[in-house]
Amino acid sequence: RLVGSEMCIRDSYHNEWDIWVYPCQQTAADDYVYARTYDEKVKTALQQGKKVLLIPENVKGRKTKFASHFWNPIMFNWNPMIVGTLIDSNHPAFGEFPTTSYADWQWWDILNYATAMELNDLTDITPIIQSIDTYEYNQKLGIAFEARIGKGSLFILCADPDKDIEKRPAMRQLLHSVKNYVASKAFTPVKELQIYQLDALFAPSV
């Protein structure tokens, strides 16, 4: 949950912070297929009409970083050339992960372990978590998105769910929220993709 915290010193100085407090241990629903690799098992599950949560271990794209607007590629020419993050804060995937439409400090340990996929060819897909590219390139970059694949439903999240996870409470809570969403009846993606589009998205770099 989001908690406002204030500190005043002799009525002269005033500071205010937002603090995010998450449960230590939670049990998430598991009525879906969980995968770390896009492979034939994932394709078969989708063709059988199953729900799939794919958190790819290896994915093409740009490694993201959390940075304030000052540290942007307009002023500093350095990778990943991203100027911010746009979040669909009203999406039910965030039902148990309070967020605004921009990346506040609870996104630090998520974005520093994430990859933004280039989704230019997926014209109908709007990312749920989207990295904002510099105006020089203006690529459509997605960290999370969902789609209907035939009779199946797919949610892709490109953020490391394992590395240093004991030190990343926000990532644990985001995973919990996403897992419960994917397992729920609310997980009914509207936009459709074809298997060949996923194949191209995950094809090895030449």
Map each language-model feature to its residues:
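Short, small-residue-biased leader/transition segments that mark boundaries at the very start
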Residues: 2-9
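Short strand-coil-strand connectors
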Residues: 10-13, 148-150
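Short beta-strand elements
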Residues: 12-30
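Residues that act as N-cap/strand-start positions at coil-to-secondary-structure junctions
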Residues: 13, 38, 139-141
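Short, charged low-complexity linker/loop segments at the C-terminal edge of domains
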Residues: 25-28, 183-191
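Short alpha-beta junction capping motif
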Residues: 26, 30-77, 148-155, 178-181
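Short amphipathic C-terminal alpha-helix that caps PH/PH-like domains
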Residues: 170-182
